[in-house]
Amino acid sequence: MEDDMWCVSSSGSSRSYRSETAAKYQSGPYQDLEEFEEVDDDIAVEYPCPFCASDYDLVELCHHIDEEHRHEANNGICPVCSKRVKMHMVDHITSHHRDVLKSEQKEMSYREDPYLSDKYLQPHLDELPPSMNHHQHPSKHVSDQFLSFINNSALPNQTKLVLPDSSVEDKNPIKDSSAAKEGTSSCPLSDSDKLEKAKKCEFVQGLLSSAMFDDECDSSE
C-alpha cells in the first residue's frame, strides 16, 4: 500500500517538474537562448585558407587569397571541393563554385563585391570548355534574341526611300533665276559707270532747269 502511494506521488511530482521546466523554456532567458541558437544556424559557412591557418567565408576567402597569397595561389587544394587545382584559386572558386558565392551574397549581402559580378566571372567562364561552362544564364540568351528581333523588325522602316517632289524641283529654277537677277543688280558699279551716271543726272537737271526758265520767260511776256 505504501509502495502504491509512493508511485502515485512520484509520478505526480515528475509531471509537475516537466510542466515547470517547459514553462521556463517558453519564457525568460531560455527563450532568448533558443533565438540565439536559431541565429547561429544562419551564419555563413567558413572555409579554411589553403595557404594559411585562417578561416573565412567564401567571399572573404577570395579577397584574402587575392590580396595575401596572390603569387602562391596557382596551385593548391580547393577548400570547397577538396580537389587539387592547377590554376589560380580565386579563378577556380569563381568559375566552379559560383552558386555558393551567390548564396553567400544573399545571406551576407555582399551586393557590390567584385568577385560576384558578371564582369569578373565572365572572362573565367569564357576560358572554360563548353561542357564545363554550365553557369551561363539562359535569360541572357533570351534577351539577345529579343534584341535581335527588335533590330530586324526595324529594317523595313529603314528601307523606305523618300522620293523627291517634282513640284519642288520645278520651283528651284525660278528661285535660282531670281537669285541670279538679284545678284547682278546688287553688284557694285565701277568708277566709269558712276561718272557716266553722274553726267546723265547733270544733263537731265540742265534740261529741266532750262525748260523751267523758258516757261517763266513766256509767262512774263
UniProtKB/Swiss-Prot annotation:
Keyword Lipid biosynthesis: no
Domain of life: Eukaryota
Tissue: Expressed in seedlings, roots, leaves, stems, flowers and siliques.
Induction: By high-salt stress, but not by abscisic acid.
Predominant subcellular localization, coarse grouping: cytoplasm
Region described as Disordered: spans on this chain: 1-24, 162-193
PTM comment text: Not phosphorylated in vitro by CPK3 or CPK11.
Gene Ontology cellular-component annotations: cytoplasm; nucleus
Keywords: Cytoplasm, Nucleus
Subcellular location: Cytoplasm; Nucleus
Family assignment from sequence similarity: Belongs to the Di19 family.
The protein's name: Protein DEHYDRATION-INDUCED 19 homolog 2
Source organism phylogeny: Eukaryota, Viridiplantae, Streptophyta, Embryophyta, Tracheophyta
